[in-house]
């Protein structure tokens, strides 16, 4: 209930149903205006804004209203009335009514905030916003996002509860296990020289819960990774962690697809059709990404076979390299791109390791069947290195038409995929080529392993992912092994990923062997899991959604920092609390830790 000693209703919830009633509201002064001897106060709370009118007929209230300033906390008692015709505000829930003040009480005064809270267009540095995050979160946009997140999380819980899942907490203090990023370590006071690790995910514990017989588990879990930050990464983040037993890949995907459909319908009244499916190989071939944005109708076309014999080493080299790739990206209407725009895209792909960006402008493709007019039909510095047959085949394969442009990537396949995949996304957004607002997708059949630069195998997901095929097939051809893994992609962002897990000791040992993990190392790091696999582990699998990332997409924020109450900066620091910080010598001594003077000196120097 809203009613309390202080208020009868939230400011943003006062509606026409309360007209002629006397009510009390509390909140912050969002804006104060003085018009012709009448004072208007915009009162703000988490539910929205209410316009309050204070006139001289109530002299005591008027005097207080004259003295209040933005961000004062006040209580107002008054009569709800209809706004005068022409003064309504359709953008506010309370936009057809106002509160005529009778009594005003100042509950707390406020200094002038370090940045305006009533101007969403104000440009304020993120560091300043995070330093005063408790003020930043008063802004209506931030209030709306935090409320949205809370309600979306509640919708997730309801769906999983209704589908028989149990909310089980797993430990925060655990042991270090390699999962692809650095662990945050916590020294043990009772066992000097030993350390806990904060979990990068509840992966092993949720698998143990399956062994324990809790066949449907979920948790809104805090996870920690000490890694370099990007727009969609934080050192501590929240994931919706899910695990099931006795369900196959398709059944797990259907449950989780249903979850996302439920959340979008509940929160945004958006209804999705069945999510399309695409294999990893198809995604990399057509989109050069394992998380393609299907809102953008552009595809890469492999043209290496056409370039093997051209007199252009930039193309011929990768075309004849088993690890190379030559791919074309046709942009309909792209011939209108200026030299300046093309130069900007060339600079963009260099970020991803590309050494240039070749292109052909198709000014006129009308007579392509009669040969290529290199004078007026095509425009590019590279066409002089190609025969007419190659150019005709190139135009036909890409489907290029008049006024198109074709961009090329030619290098190691990994470089082409990174550079041209990113270029596809950027051009699609720059030229407003998106065909829909939301494009969900499942990507399946990932490789089990990927090769490192030094020739070793590493898990593409994690070492507990179940491969397709038998133990013998895995041992014989690890390079071609596929995993029973699946990622959920939304608008080019991976929002969730999961797999079936290994539930036999024989297969888990074979995977460890492929990864170069010997018996002793496996026992030291994962002995408790290997023991559990000896006692009847059921077939199981699951998935985890990045809650921060999902909410970021749903509310249209540019960073997950905008949907987390108290996030860290890009350098994993908290401007509000000044964390991380030094601790006193007594605390360090109790933990058996001594900070080297050189480290302290380096830290002091870098802070100057």
Swiss-Prot record:
The keyword ATP-binding applies. GO terms for molecular function: aspartate-tRNA ligase activity; aspartate-tRNA(Asn) ligase activity; ATP binding; nucleic acid binding. The keyword Acetylation does not apply. L-aspartate binds at residues 179, 225, 461, 501. GO terms for cellular component: cytoplasm. Homodimer. Belongs to the class-II aminoacyl-tRNA synthetase family. Type 1 subfamily. This is Aspartate--tRNA(Asp/Asn) ligase. It comes from Psychrobacter cryohalolentis (strain ATCC BAA-1226 / DSM 17306 / VKM B-2378 / K5). The gene is aspS.
């Amino acid at each position: 209930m809203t009613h309390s000693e202080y208020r009868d209703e939230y400011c943003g919830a006062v509606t026409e149903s309360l007209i002629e009633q006397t009510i009390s509201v509390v909140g912050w002064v969002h804006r104060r205006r003085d018009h012709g001897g009448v004072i208007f106060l915009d009162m703000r709370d988490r539910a929205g804004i209410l316009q309050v009118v204070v006139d001289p007929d109530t002299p005591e209230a008027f005097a207080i209203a004259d003295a209040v300033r933005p961000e004062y906390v006040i209580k107002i008692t008054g009569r709800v009335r209809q706004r005068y015709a022409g003064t309504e505000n359709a953008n506010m829930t309370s936009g057809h009514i106002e509160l005529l003040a009778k009594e005003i009480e100042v509950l707390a005064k406020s200094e002038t905030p370090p940045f305006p809270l009533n101007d969403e267009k104000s440009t304020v540095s993120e560091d300043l916003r995070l330093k005063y995050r408790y003020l930043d979160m008063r802004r209506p946009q931030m209030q709306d996002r935090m409320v949205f997140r809370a309600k979306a999380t509640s919708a997730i819980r309801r769906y999983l509860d209704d589908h028989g899942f149990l909310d089980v907490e797993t430990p925060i203090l655990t042991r270090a296990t390699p999962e692809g990023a650095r662990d945050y370590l916590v020294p043990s006071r009772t066992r000097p020289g030993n350390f806990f690790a904060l979990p990068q995910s509840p992966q092993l514990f949720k698998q143990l819960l399956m062994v324990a017989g809790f066949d449907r588990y979920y948790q809104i879990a805090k996870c920690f990774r000490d890694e370099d930050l990007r727009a969609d990464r934080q050192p501590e983040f929240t994931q919706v962690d899910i695990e099931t037993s006795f369900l196959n890949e398709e059944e797990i995907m259907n449950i989780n697809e249903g979850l996302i459909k439920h959340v979008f319908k509940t929160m945004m009244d958006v209804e999705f059709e069945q999510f399309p499916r695409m294999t990893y190989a198809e995604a990399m071939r057509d989109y050069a990404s394992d998380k393609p944005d299907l809102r953008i109708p552009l595809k890469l076309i492999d043209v290496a076979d056409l370039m093997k014999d051209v007199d252009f080493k930039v193309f011929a080299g990768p075309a004849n390299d088993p690890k190379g790739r030559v791919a074309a990206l046709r942009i309909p209407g792209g011939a209108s791109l200026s030299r300046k725009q093309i130069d900007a895209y060339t600079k963009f792909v260099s970020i991803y390791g590309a050494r240039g960006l070749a292109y052909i402008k198709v000014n006129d493709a009308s007579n392509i069947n009669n040969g290529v007019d290199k004078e007026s039909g095509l425009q590019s510095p590279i066409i002089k290195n190609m025969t007419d047959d190659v150019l005709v085949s190139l135009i036909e394969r890409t489907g290029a038409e008049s006024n198109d442009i074709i961009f090329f990537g030619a290098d190691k396949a990994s470089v082409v995929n990174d550079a041209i995949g990113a270029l596809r996304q950027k051009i699609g957004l720059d030229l407003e080529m998106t065909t829909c607002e939301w494009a969900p997708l499942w990507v399946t059949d990932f490789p089990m392993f990927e090769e490192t630069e030094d020739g070793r195998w590493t898990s593409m997901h994690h070492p507990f992912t179940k491969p397709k095929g038998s133990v013998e097939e895995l041992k014989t051809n690890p390079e071609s092994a596929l995993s029973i893994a699946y990622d959920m992609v939304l608008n080019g962002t991976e929002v969730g990923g999961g797999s079936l897990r290994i539930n036999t000791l024989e297969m888990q040992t074979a995977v460890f062997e492929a990864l170069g993990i010997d018996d002793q190392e496996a026992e030291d790091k994962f002995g408790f899991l290997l023991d559990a696999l000896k006692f009847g582990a059921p077939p199981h699998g699951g998935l985890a959604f990045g809650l921060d990332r999902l909410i970021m997409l749903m509310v249209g924020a540019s960073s997950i920092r905008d949907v987390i109450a108290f996030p860290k900066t890009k350098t994993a620091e908290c401007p509000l609390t000044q964390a991380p910080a030094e601790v006193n010598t007594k605390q360090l001594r109790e933990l058996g830790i001594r900070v080297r003077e050189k480290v302290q000196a380096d830290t002091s120097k870098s802070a100057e």
